[in-house]
Swiss-Prot record:
It catalyses: (2R,3S)-3-isopropylmalate = (2S)-2-isopropylmalate. It comes from Bacillus anthracis. Keywords: 4Fe-4S, Amino-acid biosynthesis, Branched-chain amino acid biosynthesis, Iron, Iron-sulfur, Leucine biosynthesis, Lyase, Metal-binding. InterPro entries: 3-IsopropMal_deHydase_lsu, Acnase/IPM_dHydase_lsu_aba_1/3, Acoase/IPM_deHydtase_lsu_aba, Aconitase_4Fe-4S_BS, Aconitase_4Fe-4S_dom, IPM_dehydratase_rel_enz, IPMI_cat. The keyword Amino-acid biosynthesis applies. This is 3-isopropylmalate dehydratase large subunit. The gene is leuC. Its cofactor is [4Fe-4S] cluster. Transmembrane segments: none annotated. Its EC number is 4.2.1.33. Catalyzes the isomerization between 2-isopropylmalate and 3-isopropylmalate, via the formation of 2-isopropylmaleate. Pathway: Amino-acid biosynthesis; L-leucine biosynthesis; L-leucine from 3-methyl-2-oxobutanoate: step 2/4.
C-alpha cells in the first residue's frame, strides 16, 4: 500500500520510538516569539543548558507590539516580554528579527517569505497557527512552552503520530470567493472537532489553481477544525516561491529533487476522506463565537439548536433568522497570519480604490511583515487605503488578539480577516466576524456586510 504525504514527512524525522509508541522527531526549524518563549529560555538557564541548534532557530516580535507607534510601548508586561526576548536571543545566540528590522513581522508570514519555510521540513513554534507552513509540504504544528524548552535544548520532540485526513477540493471558485471561504465552509459543515487526532491534507484540482498565499490561508486555519496540522503537497508553484529567497537552500536543485518525492501515493488510503466541490461556494461570514458558526452571505442566521447557540447569539447581539446584510460593522481589520500578505492587501485595495470608508467605521490595514509593507507601499497600496479612510499600520499581530493596543471596544462588531472569533478575542466584549479580505474591505465601505460577488471590482489592482 502506498504512503500518504504525512507518512513520508513523519518517517523522515523519526529518531527513535519509545515503549509507549511515541516517536522522537527531529525538528528542522524552530520559530520563536515573545509570548511563549520566556519561561522556556529561563528553563535552559536554570538547568545550565544552551540552545542546541541556534542556526535552526529564528525569533521575531509580533504579538505584543503596537502597530501605530512601534517604539512607544506603554504596556509594562508587553515591554517586559519584548525586552526579555531580546536579551534571551542575545544570550543564547538566536537570530532575532527585532522591531524595525527588515525581516520583522508575524512569525507565520516571515517564515515563508524569508525562505526559512521549505518542503519536507518539520517546523514548530509556540503558536497554534504554525500549521500555516504546511502549505509548503512541511509538517508544521504549534507546541506549548514546555515543548519550546525541549526543542531549544534538544532539537527534538516526543510526539504520537496522528491519523491522515484527505480533503479533496474540486471545481473552480467564483469571483469574490477565496480560500478563506473554503475553510470557513469546511468548519461550518463539519465543526471545530472534525480534525481532532488528524493532520489535514488538502489536495485536488482547486489546490492546483491556488497561489501559495491562498494555500497558506487554508493550512493556517486547519487548527480551527481541531487538526494537528494542515499540509499540501509541494508543486512547481511551491518551488518557484521558495527559490531565491534569503534562507532558501544554496544547493537548490538538489533539494528540489527531494521535494518532488513529497506527495501522497496514488494507492495510499486516508484514515478519513472529505470531498468538497467549491464551484457553488459563496463568501462566508461567521456570526457566533467559534469559527464553525458561519453562514454564506446569502443565507440568514440559523435557529438556536443548543445552549452554545443561545450563548453565542446573546454575546454577539444577534437574533436567529437575521439577515447577514443587517449585521452592523463598526470596525474592520485586514491583517493577521491568515490574511496579511501582499495578495490579500491587493485584493482589499481593489475593492476600496476610489471609494470611502463609511462614516463611523474604523478600518485598519496591518501588513504581516516589514517586507509585505514595503512591497505594498512600492505599489502605492497605502495611498489607496489612506485615501479611502483606512489606517495604514506597521507590521504585527495587531487586532487579531487583545494583547496589544489594537482592540475592539465592548459590544461593537468587527469584520476581521483573522482566524478566531472567541469571546473577548479582540478585546473584552468584542464581537468578531471572520471574513475574507474582500468581504472585510466591502464592509468598511457600507458599515455592514454585503455580497462581494455583486460589487464591481476586478480582484486585481491597476497601478497606473
Amino acid at each position: 500500500m502506498g504512503k500518504r504525504l504525512l507518512d513520508k514527512l513523519w518517517e523522515r524525522h523519526v529518531v527513535t520510538t519509545n515503549e509507549n509508541g511515541l516517536d522522537l522527531l527531529y525538528i528542522d526549524l524552530h520559530l520563536v516569539h515573545e509570548v511563549t518563549s520566556p519561561q522556556a529560555f529561563e528553563g535552559l538557564r536554570l538547568t545550565n543548558r544552551t540552545v542546541r541548534r541556534p542556526d535552526l532557530t529564528f525569533a521575531t516580535m509580533d504579538h505584543n507590539i503596537p502597530t501605530k507607534d512601534v517604539w512607544n510601548i506603554t504596556d509594562r508586561i508587553a515591554k517586559q516580554q519584548l525586552d526579555t526576548l531580546r536579551e534571551n536571543c542575545k544570550q543564547f545566540q538566536v537570530p532575532l528579527a527585532d522591531i524595525g528590522d527588515e525581516e520583522q513581522g508575524i512569525v507565520h508570514v516571515i517564515g515563508p517569505e524569508l525562505g526559512l519555510t521549505q518542503p519536507g521540513k518539520t517546523i514548530v513554534c509556540g503558536d497554534s497557527h504554525t500549521a500555516t507552513h504546511g502549505a509548503f509540504g512541511a509538517l508544521a504544528f504549534g507546541i506549548g512552552t514546555s515543548e519550546v524548552e525541549h526543542v531549544l535544548a534538544t532539537q527534538t520532540l516526543w510526539q504520537r503520530k496522528p491519523k491522515a485526513m484527505g480533503i479533496e477540493l474540486k471545481g473552480k471558485l467564483q469571483k469574490g470567493v477565496y480560500a478563506k471561504d473554503i475553510i470557513l465552509h469546511l468548519l461550518s459543515k463539519y465543526g471545530v472537532a472534525v480534525g481532532t487526532g488528524y493532520v489535514m491534507e488538502f489536495y485536488g484540482e482547486t489546490i492546483g489553481t491556488m497561489e501559495m498565499e491562498e494555500r497558506m490561508t487554508l493550512c493556517n486555519m486547519a487548527i480551527e477544525g481541531g487538526a494537528k496540522a494542515g499540509i499540501i503537497a509541494p508543486d512547481e508553484k511551491t518551488f518557484a516561491y521558495v527559490k531565491g529567497r534569503k534562507y532558501a537552500p544554496r544547493d537548490y536543485e538538489t533539494f528540489e529533487k527531494k521535494w518532488f518525492e513529497l506527495y501522497t501515493d496514488a494507492d495510499a488510503i486516508y484514515d478519513l476522506h472529505i470531498s468538497i466541490d467549491v464551484t457553488d461556494l459563496a463568501p462566508y461570514v461567521t456570526w457566533g463565537t467559534n469559527p464553525s458558526m458561519g453562514v454564506r452571505i446569502d443565507e440568514k442566521l440559523p435557529e438556536k439548536h443548543d445552549v452554545n447557540d443561545e450563548r453565542a447569539f446573546s454575546y454577539m447581539g444577534l437574533i436567529p433568522g437575521q439577515s447577514t446584510y443587517d449585521i452592523p460593522v463598526q470596525h474592520v481589520f485586514i491583517g493577521s497570519c491568515t490574511n496579511s500578505r501582499l495578495s490579500d492587501l491587493e485584493i482589499a485595495a481593489s475593492v476600496v480604490k476610489g471609494r470611502k470608508v463609511k462614516e463611523g467605521v474604523r478600518a485598519l490595514v496591518v501588513p504581516g511583515s516589514k517586507r509585505v509593507r514595503d512591497a505594498a507601499m512600492q505599489k502605492g497600496l497605502h495611498h489607496i487605503f489612506e485615501e479611502a479612510g483606512f489606517e495604514w499600520r506597521e507590521p504585527g499581530c495587531s487586532m487579531c488578539l487583545g494583547m496589544n493596543p489594537d482592540q475592539v471596544p465592548e459590544g461593537e462588531h468587527c469584520a476581521s480577516t483573522s482566524n478566531r472569533n472567541f469571546e473577548g478575542r479582540q478585546g473584552k466584549g468584542a464581537r468578531t466576524h471572520l471574513v475574507s479580505p474582500a468581504m472585510a474591505a466591502a464592509a468598511a465601505l457600507y458599515g455592514h456586510f454585503v455580497d462581494i460577488r455583486k460589487e464591481s471590482y476586478d480582484g486585481a489592482i491597476s497601478y497606473s
